[in-house]
C-alpha cells in the first residue's frame, strides 16, 4: 500500500504538465529520477559537505550526467533555489556545463509544450544566465526556443516566449552578433513573426521587434544576404511598415548603402534559402506530424490525419499564415526517395493541394499560391532542384479532370504572377517559369502539357491567358526542343522585350507596384475574383482519397480532347454529369435555364420550384438541381466590373442587375409568401457557394427601387429588409453579423459603391447600423476628404443618420483606439449631427492627454462655445492631474475666465466647499444647488490640484481674478482650515491667495450657530475687500526678482495662522 502511495506521489511532476491518463515517457522518468537521486545525496548536508561529495561523485560519467540533470530540474522548477543551484553547478561541473546545455536543448526541442508555466519562465531565466556567462553551445538552446516561437499564434504563452527572447537578444546584442547563423535565424524568424503582430493590442511589442530587426539587418547585412529568396518573400508581407519601407528603398535603389558586396535584390532572389531557415519556422511537433503524413500515410487514408492537423494548427484566424510556411517546408525540405515515389504513400502535391484549397482567408490563400510557385520564378536548372517545382505542376495536372477549379485558380495565378511579380525584370521571371516547364517535360514529370493547358474544362478567358503567356508550350511536342533553356533566346526578343520596352517605370516612388515588385497581400482582390473558394465537401473529395486511384493513372491526350473547346466551363461540367430525371413540374423550366442561362428562364424555374414540397424530390435529384444551379449562377456573374459604371444612367444600371443571380433577388422581392423546404435548401447552398450574395442583394435593391420608381412615379418602391433577413436565415447567421461581413467585403471590392449604399444601409437597418462601431470603422478606413464632405452633406440634408444620442458615448469610447485620421473624420461627423454636449461629456474624466489627443482637441473646441455649468466643471475637475498639470483643464478655465469669471469662480468655490463639513455641526450637509451627486465627483485634492496648476499658468496677474471673489476666498479659507499639514504645505501658494481680513472675519463670523454666510449680494465692505484681494494677488504675481514667491507665501501663511490662532482664543 505504501509503495502504491509513493508511486502516485512520484507521478506528480513539477516540470511537466501531466493529466491522469498521461504515461511518463523515458525523458520524464529520467529527469525525475535524477532529481530524486540528487535530493537523497545532498539532503541534510552543508554547502561545503555537498560540494566535496559532489566533486567526488562527478568523476564518474553516469553520476555526472545524473547530477547535472538533477541540478537542471531544480533550476527549472524552484525559482527560489535557482540562483544558488546555478552557483553550485558551476562549481561541480567538469565539462563547462555541456551536459546541462545538451539536455536542455533536447528538453526544449521535444518537451517544450509539456513544460509547466513555472518551468517556462525559469527556462528564460536560465537562458539569460547562460548567455551572460557565455556558456558554450547555448546558441543551440536559443535556436530551438526560436522554433517554439510559432507563427500564426498570438496566444499569451507564445507572446511571452517571443518577447523574452527579444529582450535577451537586445540585452546581449554583442554576443548575438558573434554568431552569424543565429543572427540569420533571428532575423528570419522575427520578420516572419512581425507579420502576425498587426493587432493594435500588440503595437508596443511590434515596435520593439521592428526596431531590433531593422537595426540588426542594417548592421549585419553581410550575414543577411545568405537568407536568399524566401527572406524577400517575408519582407514583402511587412513592406508597409515605415521602417521596412525605408529598407525596401535602400534594397531597390541604393544597395551599396547596405553592404559593398550587395548588388541588388536580384542577388537575393537567385540564392536558394537554406532548409534550416525554412525548418525554424515550423514547431518541432508540427514538423514531425507533417513529415509523418508525407512519409507513412497511404494515399486515400489521409483524411483523418488532415482533420486532426486542421483542428490542431488552423483553429484561429491568425493561423492561416502558417500555410505558406508549411508549403515552403514541404517543397524544399521533404524530398521523397524513388521508393516512396513508387509506393502508395500520399504524394506531396496532394498535401499541398489540401493546404491551398482548404484556406478560406484570401490573403493567406494568395500567399500560399505564391509559396507553391515561388521557385518557378527564379528557376535555374544548373543550380536549383527539380523537386522544388514538381509539386506545382502535379497538383494542377492531377486535378484538371475531376476538379478543374483547383487547376483553374492555380493556372490563372501562375499566368498573372509571371507578368506582375517583378515588372521591372519581367523578362527574367518569364525565363525562370519557362525553364521550369522545359525541365518538367524533359524529366517526364508529366508526359506533356496539352491536357492541362488545352483542357476544355478551362474557361475561354483563362485559355486565352495561357496562350498569351505560354504560346510555345501549346505547339506540338516535336517542336519543344527549340524552347528556352538557361540563356535568353529569340523567344525573349519576340515576346518579352516588346512588352518590357513599352512599359515605363516611375522609380521615384517606393511603392512596390511602381518598382515592379508586387505585394501579394495588395493584389488579393484580383485573386479573389478569379478564385473559387471550394466547399468542405469539394475539398474532401479532391484530396481525401476518393479519387486516389483515378489520379494515380496517367491520362492520355485522347481522353481529354473533345470538340467542345469553345464551350463555357459550366457547360463542360454539366455535359460530364449524367442526366437526372426530375419532376414534371420543373423538368422543362430547369432544362431551359441550363440551356439559355438567363434571368428570364431562371425566374420561370424558380416560380415552378418554389411551391414544391420535399416529397417531390429524391435526395440525389435535389442535389443535382442545386449543384448545377449554384454553378451556373457563379459562372454567369462577370469576373470584372460587376457594378454599374454610372449611378444615374438607366441603361448601365439595368445592365448591371441583368444576370441570373439578380433574377433570384427580383423573384424574392416580388414574392413574399413562405417557401417550402427544397427552396430554402437551394437558397442556403447559393449563399454558401456565392459569398458575395449579401452585398450584391443590397446593391440590387438600391438599383431596382431606383429604376422602378422612375418607371412608375405613382408608386414608391422601398428596400425590403425582409429579403436580406431571408438570406441571413438561409446562411444560418445573425443579421448583424451578416451585414457587417457584407459591408466589409463590399468596401474591399468597391469603395464608391459602398459609400453610395451607405445612406440606405443606415436608413433601412437603423437599429443595427446606428452607433455601430464596426460599421463606422469600415466607413472611416476608406474615406478621404471628399467622401467626408459628401457624408456631411447627406447628414445636413437629413438623408443620413449615423449616430443617435443614446449610446453615442459608448461608440466614442470604442473609437478612441482608431487611427488619428479616422478619429478626426469621426468628430466632424459627430459635429454634423448637432449632438448636445451633455450626451458625451461623461467621457471627459476618461480621456488622457497622451493617448487621446484627438478627442481632447474636439472637446476643447466644443467647450469654447459653451458656458460653464456645475456638471461640466465637476467632470473636468474629476480628471487626473499629473505633476505638470492638465493643459486641457487649464486651457478651458483660462478661456472661460475671460467671459464668465464670476460664474466660474462661484461654481468651483461651491464644489470645493462641498468637500468639507459644514461649520455648524448640527446642520445636515446638503450639496450646493445645481451640483449633482455622482460617483465621479472630484476629491478636494483634485480641485486644489487643478486650481494650483491654473494659478501657475497665470502670468503678470492675468486670469487671477478667479481667486478674488468672495465665494472663492471663503472656499480657500475653508480648505485651509480643514487640510492637514502636508496639504497645507503642498498648496501653500494657493492658500496664500486668501485675504487676511476675510480669513479672520470668516472664522469669527462662522463661529455662531446658525449664522448665515454672505449671499451673492455684496455690500460696500465686501466690495472693498475684493479690491484689496485683487491688489494683493497682483502683488504676488508681479513681485520683482529680489522677492521669492514661495518665501512670501510661507510668511503669509504663518501670519494668517497666527491670526487664526488669536481669533480662536478671542472666541473662546
Curated annotation (Swiss-Prot):
UniProt record similarity statement: Belongs to the Integrator subunit 3 family.
Subunit relationships: Belongs to the multiprotein complex Integrator, at least composed of IntS1, IntS2, IntS3, IntS4, omd/IntS5, IntS6, defl/IntS7, IntS8, IntS9, IntS10, IntS11, IntS12, asun/IntS13, IntS14 and IntS15. The core complex associates with protein phosphatase 2A subunits mts/PP2A and Pp2A-29B, to form the Integrator-PP2A (INTAC) complex.
Positions carrying Phosphoserine: 1038-1039, 1043-1044
Keywords, sorted A to Z: Cytoplasm, Nucleus, Phosphoprotein
Main location: nucleus
Function per UniProt: Component of the integrator complex, a multiprotein complex that terminates RNA polymerase II (Pol II) transcription in the promoter-proximal region of genes. The integrator complex provides a quality checkpoint during transcription elongation by driving premature transcription termination of transcripts that are unfavorably configured for transcriptional elongation: the complex terminates transcription by (1) catalyzing dephosphorylation of the C-terminal domain (CTD) of Pol II subunit Polr2A/Rbp1 and Spt5, and (2) degrading the exiting nascent RNA transcript via endonuclease activity.
Organism: Drosophila sechellia (Fruit fly)
This protein's record includes keyword Transmembrane helix: no
Protein name: Integrator complex subunit 3 homolog
GO cellular component entries: cytoplasm; nucleus
Superkingdom of this protein's organism: Eukaryota
Record region (Disordered): 916-939, 1001-1068
Compartment(s) where it occurs, according to its Swiss-Prot or TrEMBL record: Nucleus; Cytoplasm
Gene expressing this chain: IntS3
Entries under InterPro entries matching the protein: HEAT_Ints3_C (IPR056518), INTS3 (IPR045334), INTS3_N (IPR019333)
Pfam family, one: HEAT_Ints3_C
UniProt KW Zinc-finger keyword: no
UniProt xrefs under PANTHER family: INTEGRATOR COMPLEX SUBUNIT 3 (PTHR13587:SF7)
Amino acid at each position: 500500500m505504501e509503495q502504491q502511495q509513493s508511486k502516485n506521489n512520484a507521478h506528480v511532476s513539477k516540470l511537466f504538465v501531466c493529466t491522469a491518463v498521461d504515461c511518463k515517457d523515458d525523458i520524464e522518468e529520467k529527469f525525475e529520477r535524477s532529481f530524486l537521486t540528487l535530493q537523497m545525496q545532498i539532503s541534510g548536508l552543508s554547502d561545503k559537505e555537498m560540494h566535496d561529495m559532489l566533486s567526488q561523485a562527478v568523476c564518474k560519467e553516469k553520476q555526472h550526467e545524473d547530477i547535472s540533470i538533477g541540478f537542471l530540474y531544480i533550476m527549472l522548477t524552484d525559482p527560489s533555489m535557482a540562483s544558488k543551484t546555478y552557483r553550485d553547478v558551476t562549481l561541480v561541473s567538469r565539462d563547462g556545463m555541456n551536459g546541462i546545455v545538451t539536455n536542455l536543448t533536447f528538453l526544449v526541442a521535444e518537451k517544450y509544450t509539456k513544460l509547466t508555466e513555472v518551468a517556462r519562465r525559469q527556462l528564460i531565466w536560465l537562458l539569460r544566465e547562460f548567455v551572460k556567462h557565455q556558456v558554450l553551445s547555448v546558441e543551440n538552446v536559443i535556436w530551438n526556443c526560436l522554433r517554439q516561437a510559432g507563427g500564426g499564434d498570438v496566444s499569451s504563452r507564445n507572446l511571452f516566449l517571443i518577447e523574452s527572447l527579444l529582450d535577451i537578444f537586445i540585452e546581449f546584442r554583442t554576443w548575438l552578433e558573434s554568431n552569424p547563423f543565429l543572427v540569420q535565424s533571428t532575423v528570419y524568424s522575427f520578420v516572419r513573426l512581425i507579420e502576425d503582430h498587426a493587432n493594435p493590442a500588440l503595437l508596443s511589442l511590434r515596435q520593439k521587434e521592428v526596431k531590433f530587426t531593422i537595426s540588426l539587418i542594417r548592421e549585419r547585412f553581410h550575414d543577411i544576404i545568405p537568407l536568399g529568396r524566401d527572406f524577400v518573400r517575408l519582407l514583402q508581407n511587412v513592406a508597409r511598415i515605415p521602417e521596412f519601407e525605408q529598407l525596401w528603398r535602400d534594397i531597390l535603389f541604393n544597395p551599396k548603402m547596405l553592404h559593398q558586396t550587395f548588388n541588388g535584390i536580384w542577388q537575393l532572389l537567385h540564392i536558394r534559402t537554406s532548409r534550416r531557415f525554412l525548418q525554424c519556422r515550423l514547431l518541432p511537433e508540427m514538423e514531425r506530424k507533417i513529415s509523418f503524413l508525407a512519409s507513412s500515410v497511404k494515399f486515400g487514408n489521409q483524411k483523418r490525419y488532415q482533420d486532426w492537423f486542421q483542428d490542431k494548427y488552423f483553429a484561429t484566424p491568425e493561423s492561416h499564415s502558417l500555410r505558406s510556411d508549411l508549403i515552403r517546408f514541404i517543397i524544399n525540405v521533404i524530398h521523397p526517395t524513388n521508393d516512396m515515389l513508387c509506393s502508395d504513400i500520399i504524394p506531396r502535391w496532394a498535401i499541398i493541394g489540401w493546404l491551398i484549397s482548404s484556406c478560406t482567408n484570401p490573403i493567406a490563400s494568395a500567399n500560399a499560391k505564391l509559396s507553391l510557385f515561388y521557385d518557378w520564378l527564379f528557376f535555374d536548372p544548373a543550380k536549383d532542384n527539380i523537386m522544388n517545382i514538381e509539386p506545382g505542376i502535379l497538383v494542377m495536372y492531377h486535378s484538371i479532370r475531376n476538379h478543374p477549379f483547383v487547376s483553374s485558380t492555380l493556372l490563372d495565378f501562375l499566368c498573372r504572377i509571371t507578368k506582375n511579380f517583378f515588372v521591372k525584370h519581367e523578362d527574367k521571371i518569364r525565363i525562370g517559369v519557362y525553364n521550369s516547364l522545359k525541365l518538367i517535360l524533359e524529366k517526364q514529370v508529366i508526359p506533356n502539357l496539352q491536357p492541362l493547358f488545352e483542357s476544355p474544362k478551362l474557361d475561354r478567358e483563362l485559355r486565352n491567358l495561357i496562350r498569351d503567356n505560354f504560346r510555345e508550350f501549346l505547339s506540338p511536342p516535336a517542336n519543344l526542343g527549340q524552347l528556352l533553356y538557361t540563356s535568353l533566346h529569340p523567344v525573349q526578343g519576340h515576346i518579352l522585350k516588346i512588352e518590357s520596352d513599352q512599359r515605363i517605370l516611375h522609380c521615384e516612388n517606393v511603392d512596390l507596384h511602381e518598382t515592379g515588385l508586387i505585394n501579394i497581400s495588395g493584389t488579393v482582390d484580383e485573386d479573389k475574383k478569379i478564385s473559387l473558394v471550394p466547399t468542405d465537401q469539394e475539398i474532401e473529395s479532391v484530396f481525401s482519397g476518393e479519387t486516389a486511384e483515378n489520379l494515380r493513372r496517367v491520362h492520355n491526350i485522347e481522353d481529354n480532347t473533345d470538340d467542345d473547346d469553345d464551350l463555357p466551363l459550366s457547360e463542360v461540367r454539366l455535359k460530364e454529369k449524367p442526366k437526372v430525371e426530375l419532376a414534371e413540374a420543373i423538368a422543362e423550366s430547369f432544362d431551359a435555364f441550363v440551356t439559355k442561362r438567363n434571368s428570364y428562364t431562371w425566374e420561370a424555374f424558380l416560380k415552378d420550384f418554389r411551391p414544391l414540397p420535399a416529397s417531390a424530390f429524391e435526395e440525389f435529384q435535389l442535389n443535382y438541381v442545386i449543384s448545377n444551379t449554384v454553378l451556373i449562377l457563379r459562372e454567369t456573374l462577370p469576373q470584372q466590373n460587376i457594378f454599374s459604371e454610372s449611378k444615374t444612367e438607366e441603361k448601365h444600371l439595368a445592365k448591371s442587375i441583368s444576370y441570373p443571380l439578380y433574377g433570384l433577388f427580383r423573384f424574392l422581392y416580388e414574392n413574399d409568401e413562405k417557401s417550402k423546404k427544397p427552396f430554402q435548401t437551394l437558397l442556403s447552398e447559393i449563399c454558401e457557394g456565392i459569398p458575395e450574395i449579401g452585398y450584391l442583394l443590397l446593391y440590387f435593391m438600391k438599383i431596382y427601387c431606383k429604376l422602378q420608381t422612375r418607371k412608375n412615379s405613382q408608386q414608391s418602391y422601398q428596400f425590403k429588409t425582409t429579403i436580406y433577413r431571408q438570406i441571413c436565415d438561409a446562411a444560418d447567421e445573425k443579421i448583424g453579423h451578416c451585414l457587417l461581413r457584407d459591408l466589409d467585403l463590399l468596401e474591399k471590392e468597391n469603395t464608391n459603391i459602398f459609400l453610395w449604399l451607405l445612406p440606405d444601409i443606415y436608413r433601412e437597418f437603423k437599429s443595427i447600423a446606428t452607433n455601430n462601431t464596426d460599421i463606422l470603422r469600415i466607413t472611416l478606413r476608406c474615406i478621404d476628404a471628399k467622401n467626408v464632405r459628401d457624408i456631411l452633406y447627406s447628414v445636413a440634408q437629413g438623408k443620413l443618420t449615423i449616430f443617435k444620442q443614446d449610446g453615442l458615448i459608448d461608440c466614442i469610447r470604442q473609437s478612441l483606439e482608431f487611427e488619428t485620421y479616422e478619429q478626426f473624420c469621426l468628430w466632424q461627423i459627430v459635429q454634423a449631427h448637432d449632438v448636445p454636449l451633455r450626451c458625451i461629456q461623461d467621457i471627459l474624466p476618461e480621456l488622457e492627454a497622451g493617448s487621446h489627443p484627438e478627442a481632447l482637441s474636439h472637446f476643447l473646441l466644443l467647450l469654447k462655445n459653451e458656458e460653464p455649468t456645475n456638471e461640466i466643471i465637476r467632470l473636468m475637475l474629476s480628471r487626473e492631474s499629473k505633476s505638470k498639470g492638465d493643459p486641457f483643464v487649464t486651457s478651458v478655465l483660462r478661456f472661460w475666465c475671460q467671459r464668465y469669471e464670476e460664474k466660474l469662480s462661484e461654481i468651483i468655490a461651491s464644489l470645493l466647499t462641498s468637500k468639507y463639513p459644514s461649520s455648524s455641526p448640527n446642520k445636515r450637509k446638503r450639496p450646493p444647488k445645481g451640483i449633482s451627486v455622482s460617483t465621479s465627483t472630484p476629491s478636494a485634492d483634485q480641485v486644489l490640484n487643478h486650481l494650483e496648476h491654473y494659478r501657475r499658468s497665470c502670468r503678470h496677474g492675468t486670469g487671477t481674478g478667479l481667486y478674488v471673489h468672495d465665494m472663492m476666498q471663503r472656499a480657500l479659507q475653508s480648505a485651509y482650515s480643514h487640510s492637514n499639514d502636508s496639504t497645507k504645505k503642498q498648496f501653500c501658494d494657493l492658500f496664500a491667495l486668501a485675504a487676511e481680513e476675510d480669513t479672520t472675519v470668516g472664522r469669527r463670523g462662522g463661529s455662531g450657530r446658525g449664522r448665515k454666510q454672505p449671499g451673492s449680494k455684496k455690500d460696500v465692505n465686501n466690495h472693498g475687500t475684493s479690491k484689496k484681494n485683487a491688489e494683493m494677488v497682483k502683488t504676488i504675481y508681479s513681485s520683482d526678482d529680489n522677492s521669492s514667491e514661495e518665501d512670501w507665501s510661507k510668511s503669509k501663511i504663518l501670519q494668517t495662522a497666527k491670526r487664526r490662532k488669536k481669533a480662536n482664543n478671542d472666541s473662546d
